[in-house]
Each structure stands twice: as C-alpha cells, then as structure tokens.
Amino acid sequence: MTQTPHAGDWIRIERLTAFGIVGLHAWERERTQEIIIDASLRVDFARVAATDEVRHGVNYAEVSREMLHHAETIERHTVEALVLDLAGICLSYPGVEEVVVSVAKPRADPRARLIGVEARRLAGSMDRTALVSLGSNAGAEENLPRAAEAIAGIGRVSRVTRVYQTPPAGGRAGPDYLNAALALETPLPAGALVRRFKQIERELG
C-alpha cells in the first residue's frame, strides 16, 4: 500500500502481517484480526555501503519484529492510532530520516479489497518528552551510568538531575539507593518505550 518516494535511499518492509486486536466494535475486541503493515524508511546508505557492515545500517529485521510485536499486543481502538505508533517506532532507530507507514485491515469492509490508512513523518516531528526515574542499590555506581547511557540510545536526553542517595524504603536493611531522573525526547509510543526499558533492565541484570 505504501508508495515509496524516489528521492533518497529507502528500506522497504512490505506486507508484514500481524494478528491483533484493533477496532471499536465489540466483535472487533473479541478476536484478533489480520493487520497488513507496509513501511518505507528513508536512510543514508553511504556508511553501510562503504564498510559493508550491518552495524552501520538500520537493522530492518529488528524494526519488523518490533512493529509486529506492537501491533499484536497494543490493542488499539483505531488504525489511525496504530499507524502513528508504528511510525514512531521506525523513527526511534538512529539514522531513519523519514518514514511512510500504512496499516490496512483486509476484512474491514467485504466490498473493498482492503481499507487502510497511511502516515508520513520526518525525524524529530513525533518527539515527546518522557520523564524517566532511575534507581539501584545493586552495583548502583556502575549500573546507574550504564542505564542512563542505554536510555540515551533510545532518544535524546535533554535534562538530567544530580544523583541522590537514599536509604531503603520502610526501614529495610541493605545498601543505600542511588537515584536520578532524566528527560528523554523520543518518538516511541508508551508501550514500546516500556518494552525498551525492560530490555535495558534485563541486560543490566
């Protein structure tokens, strides 16, 4: 469904098929429906072409997996909300300059082959501010900076507080906590952002 513009370098993901809950009617909330996703991501291939190393490009398999997981778990009421969620996910990957995403429901109307929506967004146009609190009392001096660095990979950190030291809550025994907070500018929808945070938490142990 998505029509890729000719100018620039583009990654195309076509007919990614998800099965999820999307719709307003009661019957649409009872069982999953087929959801067809197309996405075109404008990037610059110069560096990855020069080095021939995947790490210098956008991992489109990872983009596909994240869009698929989001579409199958978020349970949006409208395809308009879902398509903007997916656009935000695409723009969260470093190097993506523009994205065109379409979402279609093949069985939305039996008289039409499919009915869908399309959204085009530029990098930075969907950024929102997420206020993130950090805290640890297990290897905190090492883990707190590592967590902040990992979070900076999700978006742009615009503000950071100083580090505060506090005792465990409720008078419990144990090491003191180190705490901080930061403001993160990111296009990610809330559900995808929480999943990224949980992944960082797992990686840090």
PLM regions: where:
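Core catalytic alpha/beta fold that binds nucleotide/phospho-ligands
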Residues: 77, 107, 124-205
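N-terminal, polar/charged subdomain of small-to-medium soluble alpha/beta proteins
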Residues: 1-128
